[in-house]
């Protein structure tokens, strides 16, 4: 019986799943917006939100914990220099999921995962 075993398997081994979410979290912290399937986006919240909470207190120990989970220096740098101070006064809920239709090949539900309060880049509007 699998009572109280939380988390989805995604038809992957545990190592593959762990690597996938490390890479997705690192991409999210670098780009602040990623597009993925809706189930993966929902599961990514369980990985990314605790890391942002960890980044609120900038210490060598916390940086090492974050690096152990992400294995990406650039992502850890962004996490502690940009995202930690940005969310210092927010008690959680750092990510927003926006549904964006279905993938053409297999009709999988897709979603954008973005960081809340991210700066909006003004795009040039053709007149």
Curated annotation (Swiss-Prot):
<dbReference type="Pfam" id="PF01196">
    <property type="entry name" value="Ribosomal_L17"/>
</dbReference>
<comment type="subunit">
    <text>Part of the 50S ribosomal subunit. Contacts protein L32.</text>
</comment>
<dbReference type="InterPro" id="IPR047859">
    <property type="entry name" value="Ribosomal_bL17_CS"/>
</dbReference>
<keyword id="KW-0689">Ribosomal protein</keyword>
<comment type="similarity">
    <text>Belongs to the bacterial ribosomal protein bL17 family.</text>
</comment>
<keyword id="KW-0687">Ribonucleoprotein</keyword>
<dbReference type="InterPro" id="IPR036373">
    <property type="entry name" value="Ribosomal_bL17_sf"/>
</dbReference>
<dbReference type="GO" id="GO:0006412">
    <property type="term" value="P:translation"/>
</dbReference>
<protein>
    <recommendedName>
        <fullName>Large ribosomal subunit protein bL17</fullName>
    </recommendedName>
</protein>
<dbReference type="GO" id="GO:0003735">
    <property type="term" value="F:structural constituent of ribosome"/>
</dbReference>
<dbReference type="InterPro" id="IPR000456">
    <property type="entry name" value="Ribosomal_bL17"/>
</dbReference>
<dbReference type="GO" id="GO:0022625">
    <property type="term" value="C:cytosolic large ribosomal subunit"/>
</dbReference>
């Amino acid at each position: 019986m699998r009572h109280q075993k939380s988390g989805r398997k995604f038809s992957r081994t545990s190592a593959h799943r762990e690597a996938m979410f490390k890479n997705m979290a690192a991409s999210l912290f670098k780009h602040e917006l990623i597009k993925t399937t809706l189930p993966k986006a929902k599961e990514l919240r369980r990985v990314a939100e605790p890391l942002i909470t960890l980044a609120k207190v900038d210490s060598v120990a916390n940086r090492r914990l974050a690096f152990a989970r992400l294995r990406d220096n650039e992502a850890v740098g962004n996490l502690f220099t940009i995202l930690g101070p940005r969310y210092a006064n927010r008690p959680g809920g750092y990510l927003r999921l926006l549904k964006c239709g279905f993938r053409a090949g297999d009709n999988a539900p897709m979603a954008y995962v973005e960081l809340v309060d991210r700066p909006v880049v003004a795009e040039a509007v053709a007149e």
